């Protein structure tokens, strides 16, 4: 074979090897998620999406409800307006819930902005939070992701980003016994309240948490829906005042406070520092590691001490009016830490209660009777979290 022919064969073989190597390298880039130059031109800065605490599913009389928060931080140099948020099944992208328009506005909060603000725009370098609740039906996803559509000013136009994968937490622990006797009690809570427990972050110890994510405030009423039998400004005239507060399970006492004074009048209750908001309280450590909190207890009524072992139904103290309170009630919540301000709120179920009805309008608390439960619907509820502003009765 002539020398020229040998050189031509080697050259052709080198070209083939370069072509194969180029294709192989391109495959590696694609597999690694590294954009080729043409794709890089379409990339754009937008939101950093985060779910800081796992989405939690909890059973109510309306079925399985999921509670979560989506944090959106704007890393661009221009304001981004959130126009739509979707929760999707991470396995196949099936849309599980979607929020837009006024519904999205009601769920959105810009950190540091006035509570009444309705705009869903996140300025550069700021963080917004979308408080999300959605109903499960037949599908029980193992994990979810989020798709956020947004509008940017000028030529940037509209875009969307998908991310914030999170594993759904289905465990709610062993159902608990009643924290109070009898009733009727209004189970006061509502996810949509902009300054309600469900939306209040406490940022201590370097972390932002929502201790009251699933908190319930229990207010005693009579058959006519009244909260008092005399002077509404006198704490002692409220129906629930002094009611025995009960251990919801066999547990160990983790923390107590019993020395805070109580305002002589409802209207005269002063503002309190964050560490004093709970008033007098008892925290018990459940055997599954969760902590149950009983807050705003009557001064001098706490009947247990730290380290003491208590049993379900045992009296821990009395309902009172200490701390940040607008009237005598029992604040009850469950969290993952023995601190009133530095724990993440966790879902809980009561093993049994009677559902008498509900208040559609919280403005009617103390003014009128609740809307009674439909006679055809089951009154006895088991292994459930009380629905928003439900009126319940526990066993005597």
Language-model segments: which ranges?
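Short, solvent-exposed loop/turn segments enriched in Ser/Thr/Gly
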Residues: 52-53, 62-69
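Asparagine-centered strand-capping/turn motif at beta-strand->loop junctions
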Residues: 72-79
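Acidic, glycine-rich catalytic/binding loops that coordinate metals and/or anionic ligands
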Residues: 170-189, 196-200, 206, 229, ...
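A structural signal for short beta-strand/turn segments enriched in small hydrophobics and glycine
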Residues: 251-253, 307-319
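Short histidine-centered loop motifs in beta-beta connectors
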Residues: 290-313
């Amino acid at each position: 074979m002539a020398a020229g022919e040998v050189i031509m064969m080697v050259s052709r073989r080198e070209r083939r090897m370069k072509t194969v190597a180029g294709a192989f390298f391109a495959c590696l880039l694609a597999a690694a998620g590294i954009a080729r130059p043409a794709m890089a031109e379409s990339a754009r800065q937008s939101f950093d999406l985060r779910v800081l605490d796992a989405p939690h599913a909890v059973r109510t009389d309306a079925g399985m409800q999921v509670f979560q928060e989506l944090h959106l931080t704007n890393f661009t140099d221009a304001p981004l307006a959130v126009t739509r948020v979707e929760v999707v099944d991470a396995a196949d992208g099936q849309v599980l819930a979607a929020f837009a328009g006024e519904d999205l506005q009601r769920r959105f909060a810009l950190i540091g902005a006035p509570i009444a603000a309705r705009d869903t725009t996140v300025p550069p370098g700021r963080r917004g939070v979308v408080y999300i609740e959605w109903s499960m039906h037949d599908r029980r996803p193992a994990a979810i992701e989020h798709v956020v559509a947004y509008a940017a000013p000028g030529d940037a136009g509209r875009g969307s980003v998908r991310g914030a994968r999170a594993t759904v937490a289905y465990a709610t622990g062993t159902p608990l016994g009643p924290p109070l006797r009898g009733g009727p009690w209004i189970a006061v809570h509502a996810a949509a309240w902009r300054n309600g427990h469900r939306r209040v972050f406490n940022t201590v110890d370097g972390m932002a948490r929502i201790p009251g994510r699933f908190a319930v405030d229990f207010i005693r009423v009579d058959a006519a829906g009244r909260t008092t039998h005399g002077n509404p400004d006198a704490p002692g005239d409220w129906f629930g005042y002094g009611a025995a507060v009960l251990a919801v399970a066999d547990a160990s006492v983790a923390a107590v406070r019993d020395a805070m004074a109580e305002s002589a009048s409802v209207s005269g209750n002063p503002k309190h520092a964050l560490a004093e908001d709970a008033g007098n309280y008892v925290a018990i450590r459940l055997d599954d590691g969760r902590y149950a909190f009983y807050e705003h207890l009557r001064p001098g009524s706490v009947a247990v001490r730290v380290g003491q072992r208590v049993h379900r139904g045992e009296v821990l103290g009395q309902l009172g009016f200490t701390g940040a309170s607008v009237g005598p009630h029992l604040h009850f919540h469950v969290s993952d830490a023995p601190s009133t301000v530095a724990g993440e709120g966790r879902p809980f179920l009561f093993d049994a209660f009677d559902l008498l009805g509900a208040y559609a309008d919280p403005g009617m608390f103390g003014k009128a009777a609740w809307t009674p439960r439909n006679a055809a619907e089951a009154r006895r509820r088991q292994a459930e979290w009380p629905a928003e502003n439900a009126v319940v009765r526990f066993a005597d």
